[in-house]
Amino acid sequence: MHDANIRVAIAGAGGRMGRQLIQAALGLEGVQLGAALEREGSSLLGSDAGELAGAGKTGVTVQSSLDAVKDDFDVFIDFTRPEGTLNHLAFCRQHGKGMVIGTTGFDDAGKQAIGEAAKDIAIVFAANFSVGVNVMLKLLEKAAKVMGDYTDIEIIEAHHRHKVDAPSGTALAMGEAIAHALDKDLKDCAVYSREGHTGERVPGTIGFATVRAGDIVGEHTAMFADIGERLEITHKASSRMTFANGAVRSALWLKGKDKGLFDMKDVLNLNYL
């Protein structure tokens, strides 16, 4: 990586998240927008990335080929789809580029591929790049250790109508944080759907409920419910810029790191809490 500014490339530059990532990259000191990518055949190819994001002319044109821009960036930021992200991962591993991965919906094989690539390159992989969400995950660990064995735990999440995976990656991360605090495996205690005559709630399970509606950016609540009282820990996002700023901050944090798999707890130094 260069000694001066960290140069970032943005995948899916024409999407809602891509445009905000461009804005965030242009707004953070120490970061330089080096490249912007869109799929082959996109009408946005050749556009100025800054103008596309409403941030003014930058001289960085939207490209479809990573090969064409491989010398223009140090860290690749990807919030696209699992299949595309894994293709980008292979390229970055081959060429020694760091990655910030905010894509959700990976299966176990995809997560394993990311872990393998981190033996050769530095990767920040997180379900959510919001500072508030990651503080919430730490709070959930604390609450679960105190209340988890005595309460019914439910996770409710809501997103816009265009989101294609459920539960959200953040909801799953919440479940993982709670399960880990209780020395459980989420796969063994998660309940993802209830329909018909389900019988009574099984003690020790973690329930998930999903809402998809309108333009909700992202809302997540963890509920610890007992007889006579209920604790709820909630995070609500009103703008995707909170995720974009966290992702670009993560790219800057990767400066000087050659390899390893990290998450936002590392970036924010939350592990000491």
UniProtKB/Swiss-Prot annotation:
Pathway where it operates = Amino-acid biosynthesis; L-lysine biosynthesis via DAP pathway; (S)-tetrahydrodipicolinate from L-aspartate: step 4/4
> Alphabetically, which GO biological process terms does the record hold?
diaminopimelate biosynthetic process; lysine biosynthetic process via diaminopimelate
> Where does it live in the cell?
Cytoplasm
- What EC class is this? oxidoreductase
Xref: Pfam families: DapB_C, DapB_N
| GO molecular function terms noted in the UniProt entry | 4-hydroxy-tetrahydrodipicolinate reductase; NAD binding; NADP binding; oxidoreductase activity, acting on CH or CH2 groups, NAD or NADP as acceptor
What InterPro entries does the record tag this protein with? DapB_C, DapB_N, DapB_N_CS, DHDPR_bac, NAD(P)-bd_dom_sf
What keywords appear on the UniProt entry? Answer: Amino-acid biosynthesis, Cytoplasm, Diaminopimelate biosynthesis, Lysine biosynthesis, NAD, NADP, Oxidoreductase
Give binding positions for (S)-2,3,4,5-tetrahydrodipicolinate. Answer: H160, G169, T170
What does the entry list as the binding residues for NAD(+)? G12, A13, G14, G15, R16, M17, E38, G102, T103, T104, A126, A127, N128, F129
| Catalytic activity line of the entry | (S)-2,3,4,5-tetrahydrodipicolinate + NAD(+) + H2O = (2S,4S)-4-hydroxy-2,3,4,5-tetrahydrodipicolinate + NADH + H(+); (S)-2,3,4,5-tetrahydrodipicolinate + NADP(+) + H2O = (2S,4S)-4-hydroxy-2,3,4,5-tetrahydrodipicolinate + NADPH + H(+)
Gene Ontology CC annotations of this record: cytosol
What EC identifiers does the entry list? 1.17.1.8
Record-listed NADP(+) binding positions: R39
Primary role: Catalyzes the conversion of 4-hydroxy-tetrahydrodipicolinate (HTPA) to tetrahydrodipicolinate.
Name the protein family. Belongs to the DapB family.
Q: What is this protein called?
A: 4-hydroxy-tetrahydrodipicolinate reductase
Q: Which gene encodes it?
A: dapB
